[in-house]
């Protein structure tokens, strides 16, 4: 007997657990109705009358998809046998149900009649069940159809009636009698009737021998030993030895690989090319060869240079053809062409041809093949200079078809930068004499300060450079004297204000001026001596008053010596060398 409780997702309580019953003492006391006493659907009907059909409120109609684990009424996917036995039910409800009448018969429908109405409604919508009668062919067990003895063969004619409605009874399939094979009748027949045929002992022994041979010849599969759950946890020594075996197997594999590398990789180490890691484009541009090819070429070149002479075509003159020897320690460059590299290539590759033309000017009928440059065998292909040519915009232009002085690309001297667009030439700048004249006339309307300079500009142009330099020096001398005298006068005025009584009113201004003058590096000890001399000359402070008043009232009049220096300053630009060039870092508006 195997108990197989299977859950079904149903709301009518007609599943496989509906007929599961526990025998009770109270039920055993009433032996008049054994089926009704063992069937407790009346308790369920009473419970359904009290509470609505909801998964939260009912334990019996709980859906298996319920996730409300906090509610005590929900089964939450687990089996709940509450209110099925009489142990957990209310005795008041039980007594009330027991007093109700029980309808016994084949009719499963109970009709509920409302007060004062003759209309009868069925108490349930469950279909009418036709009980299946088991055929009794076998006197002992019978002959079931599907190999299992089902409890549905036993008809149940009891239905519980309450005041509201009735839930129909279902078949009890919780307990099933299951045999090992599907065909139960054949097994029962084999058990009931023993075999009458006796087999030969010799045939049995031969079959046993053949089966033993067959089992020894075939490869046996790895059998999985069924262990208990305690051993399957792999705890303790079993887990330790399993890990140890995996670790040892991994270390053995690593040791095997290392041993294979050690034994069978000596060839790669022996024929290693070089330890230098250079990129592929550098190797290509520098004429890279493998070690084997390099050694073969070196040996062949050595034997070739010792034994035989190079083969020359018949039409080529060997005497006049120069032999270009390439040194082995040439710094190899990249193959990218720049304008300077093109110029160098054009000048270097044709140097031998220029010597030929200078030596033999009379030999006019020589072919162009004589102008080829011969070279000794070398390790790198880039050193083997063939016909002199240059590459301009991915086109090879041979230089041998032109004369030495008539190349298709004109060679320019790199030192000559007269036509360079990035150099500003000061000679091309135009003087702004008209604008200067308008500015000076607007500034000095009644005063003719620059008349001498403007009038004498034409006469100064005809002077020599030595006279111009002398005039420039005089102009700078007079300018510096005027500036220094003005600064000395300022120092004297500051000293006068410091000595006066109104010292506090001008204190901040005078301190700022004094700090600026003291921090200035222009005034040296000579300035201090001149200041002392001038202080000794000025006896009374009234002279400073007259000096300051005159300087405030009258405009600044340039002395005659300063006017003469301005005339020399007008031609100061012409005294500087005319070929001075300026960088782009200087502002454009400033002319030197």
Curated annotation (Swiss-Prot):
Residues 186-223, 528-553 are annotated as: Disordered. GO terms for cellular component: cellular bud neck. Residues 193-204, 528-537 have a biased composition (Polar residues). It is found in: Bud neck. Residues 213-222 have a biased composition (Low complexity). Its main location: other. Belongs to the AIM44 family. This is Altered inheritance of mitochondria protein 44.
């Amino acid at each position: 007997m195997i108990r197989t409780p299977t859950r079904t997702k149903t709301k009518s309580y007609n599943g496989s657990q509906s007929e599961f019953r526990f025998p009770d003492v109270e039920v055993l006391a009433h032996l008049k109705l054994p089926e009704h006493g063992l069937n407790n659907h009346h308790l369920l009907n009473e419970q359904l009358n009290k509470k609505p059909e909801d998964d939260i409120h009912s334990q019996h109609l709980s859906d298996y998809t319920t996730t409300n684990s906090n509610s005590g009424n929900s089964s939450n996917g687990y089996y709940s046998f509450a209110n099925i036995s009489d142990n957990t039910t209310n005795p008041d409800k039980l007594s009330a149900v027991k007093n109700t009448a029980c309808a016994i018969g084949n009719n499963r429908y109970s009709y509920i009649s409302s007060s004062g109405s003759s209309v009868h409604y069925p108490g349930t919508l469950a279909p009418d069940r036709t009980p299946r009668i088991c055929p009794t062919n076998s006197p002992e067990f019978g002959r079931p159809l599907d190999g299992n003895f089902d409890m549905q063969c036993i008809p149940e004619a009891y239905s519980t009636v309450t005041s509201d409605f009735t839930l129909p009874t279902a078949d009890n399939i919780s307990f099933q009698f299951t045999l090992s094979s599907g065909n139960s009748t054949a097994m029962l027949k084999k058990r009931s009737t023993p075999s009458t045929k006796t087999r030969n002992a010799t045939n049995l022994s031969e079959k046993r021998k053949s089966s033993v041979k067959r089992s020894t010849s075939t490869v046996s599969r790895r059998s999985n030993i069924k262990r208990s759950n305690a051993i399957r946890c792999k705890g303790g020594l079993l887990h330790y030895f399993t890990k140890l075996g995996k670790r040892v197997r991994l270390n053995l594999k690593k040791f095997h690989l290392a041993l294979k590398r050690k034994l069978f990789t000596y060839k790669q180490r022996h024929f290693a090319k070089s330890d230098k890691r250079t990129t592929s484009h550098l190797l290509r541009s520098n004429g890279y060869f493998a070690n084997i090819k390099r050694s073969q070429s070196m040996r062949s070149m050595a034997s070739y240079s010792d034994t035989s002479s190079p083969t020359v075509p018949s039409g080529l003159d060997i005497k006049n053809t120069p032999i270009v020897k390439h040194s082995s320690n040439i710094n190899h460059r990249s193959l990218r062409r720049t304008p300077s590299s093109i110029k160098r290539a054009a000048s270097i590759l044709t140097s031998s041809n220029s010597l030929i033309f200078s030596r033999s000017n009379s030999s006019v009928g020589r072919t162009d093949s004589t102008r080829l440059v011969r070279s000794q065998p070398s390790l790198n292909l880039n050193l083997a200079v063939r016909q002199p040519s240059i590459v301009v915009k991915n086109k090879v232009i041979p230089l041998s078809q032109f004369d030495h002085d008539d190349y298709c690309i004109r060679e320019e001297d790199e030192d000559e930068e007269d036509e360079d667009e990035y150099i500003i030439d000061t000679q091309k700048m135009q003087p702004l004499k008209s604008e200067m004249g308008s500015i000076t006339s607007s500034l000095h309307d009644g005063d003719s300060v620059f008349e001498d300079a403007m009038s004498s500009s034409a006469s100064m142009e005809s002077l020599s450079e030595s006279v111009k330099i002398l005039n420039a020096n005089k102009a700078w001398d007079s300018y510096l004297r005027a500036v220094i005298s003005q600064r000395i006068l300022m120092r004297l005025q500051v000293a006068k204000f410091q000595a006066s009584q109104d010292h506090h009113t001008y204190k901040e201004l005078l301190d700022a001026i004094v700090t600026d003058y003291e921090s200035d590096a222009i005034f040296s000890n000579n300035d201090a001596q001149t200041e002392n001399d001038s202080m000794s000359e000025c006896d009374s402070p009234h002279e400073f008053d007259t000096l300051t008043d005159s300087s405030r009232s009258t405009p600044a009049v340039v002395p005659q010596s300063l006017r003469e220096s301005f005339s020399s300053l007008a031609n100061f630009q012409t005294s500087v060398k005319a070929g001075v060039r300026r960088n782009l870092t200087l502002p454009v508006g400033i002319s030197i």
